[in-house]
Amino acid sequence: MSISKLTASNLTVTLGISMRSGYTIWGTALIFYLVFLGWHENWRGPLTESEIAIFTARAQSINGLSAEQLAHFEMFMRDDDGGEFFMVNLVGFTEGPASHPETGAKVDARELVQSYFRPFAVKILARAGYPAFSARTLSGYIEAWGVAANPGWDIANLMRYRSRRDLLMSATDEDFSDIHIYKRAAIAATFAVPSQSIGGALFS
């Protein structure tokens, strides 16, 4: 066999191996991407009427929710488009040490709230929910009108949820209600507003 034929044969084998390796890499990448999409996106559509009825009953059983909150809760469910959303959340911790709800011991509020957040984060991560943004405040309001006085906000958060169903399944979970006492004890003031992205560099 001539050298030129040997070289051509070796080149063909090398190209064949390279192509198979390329197919393997791209095939693996495609599988991972499809698995990611299956986890990250909501494939079940908006809430159904039966789901709304179930979650409404669960919400009504939660102590401390006002009639206004329940009305907002129902509107939030009925306006569901099946898409992702972000929960805008401001948090103000208790001044000084917080009282542990079980032992009464004085503990750091930021450490105490982790007893709530860590288990909750695990639950929502399983449903493709995660912190999209978290930051500490640097001062009081720079600009504000028509709002109540700043109660002392410490943290600003944006939590991403795959769907309203996923939030409601987590928020009405019995295990979640058991750990909510840590959040109540550690946080002096908070509000949470569900929002949907309309653009921007991070969330477009």
Question: What are the roles of these predicted feature ranges?
Answer:
Residues 99, 163-173:
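Short amphipathic alpha-helices within nucleic acid-binding modules
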Residues 155-160:
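Active-site scaffold segments
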Residues 182, 187-188:
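Catalytic cores of eukaryotic secretory-pathway lumenal/extracellular enzymes that build
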Residues 191-194:
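Eukaryotic helix-grip
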